[in-house]
Swiss-Prot record:
One of its GO terms (molecular function) is histidine-tRNA ligase activity. Belongs to the class-II aminoacyl-tRNA synthetase family. HisZ subfamily. Disulfide bonds: none annotated. Heteromultimer composed of HisG and HisZ subunits. This is ATP phosphoribosyltransferase regulatory subunit. InterPro entries: aa-tRNA-synth_II/BPL/LPL (IPR045864), HisRS-like_core (IPR041715), HisRS/HisZ (IPR004516), HisZ (IPR004517). Its main location: cytoplasm.
Amino acid sequence: MSDSAFSKDNRWLLPEGVDELLPPRAAQMETLRRQLLDQFGAWGYELVMPPFIEYLDSLLTGTGHDLDVQTFKLTDQLTGRLMGVRADITPQVARIDAHRLRREAPSRLCYIGSVLHARPEGISRSRNPVQVGAELFGHAGVESDIEIISLAVASLRTAGVAQPHLDLGHVGIFRGLARAAGCTPAQEGALLEALQRKAVAEIDELLDEAAIDPHLRRMLRALPQLNGGLEALDHAGEVLAEAPQGVRQALRTLWGVAAGLERRLPDLPLHFDLAELRGYGYHTGIVFAALVPGYGSEVARGGRYDDIGRVFGNPRPATGFSADLRTLVQVADGQPAVPAGKGVLAPWGDEPDLIKVIEALRAEGERVVQELPGQQGGAAAQGCDRRLQQDDGGGWVTRPL
């Protein structure tokens, strides 16, 4: 937008991709925030509140290039050091677990807060999402992956997403094959990009240029086709039967998570994609995304990221998920938290009996709005469907409008 666009008449414009919430959507989101934190607590997850801004070297430690380019940077006027406005809360929570809590036992931590992105992550995506999530530190088994995915699905259902679809992968399969093939970092990166686009011709060309062992080439070439339901894992077992041990272990891990989810969530649609490598520079194992039919991108995502605690001096296995609260409210099947037109319009006054009645109604959970002297608009404009009036005996009663 040109400088001339910012005239006195439109100085109220928000930056592109930056959103604000109005009634009743803001109330709906706040209600969901409370519900999700209560749910996390019921599962044993403790709330942490990292700062909105940190020194850049701490904020980006162990996170990779993607988060770096999404982070707004500025100079601390007190120290002259570079600072960053967080674009993702997960690394901050990992720092808290590794550096501040330093527990031996597993830690279950949850969070919710605003983040800021330098660029939107997709078409019509906000640059100031409200990130909510949960992380489980200190356990490397499939059980913790199953718990995190189950909690993610439960959270989506709490938000009103009745039937999410789950897309599962494991970054260790491609990583193990690429490393066994002796790919350089540049070759691995080029293959990664082509796999994510399922650009088969480009994959063939890259494999030809790399002069890879024929057996490993065949396995890498097959990854874009290894997607679907549980039958995709059966097919992967055949294709990767002679793969390196680490690759076969990654596939067994994927099978273990799938079996656990089928027992816990038998009605949850599962889809597997071995070329699904989101967060490749960050994740180390299982990766997943929750999708909703009719919505163009994931509504929640997560996975395992065992290496991040190492840079804080306390290497711990870790797995977790996150979602944007704004997105959850947008795609939810539920109704607004505060239905329009529900409330009591009370007269203005400071008589003790009137104040006592108003306080009692509010204590019972009623929404009570006092009518200001000389105000424009009646009960409907205030979102009220009843009025507080005095009866013939001087007592206060609510009457429908």
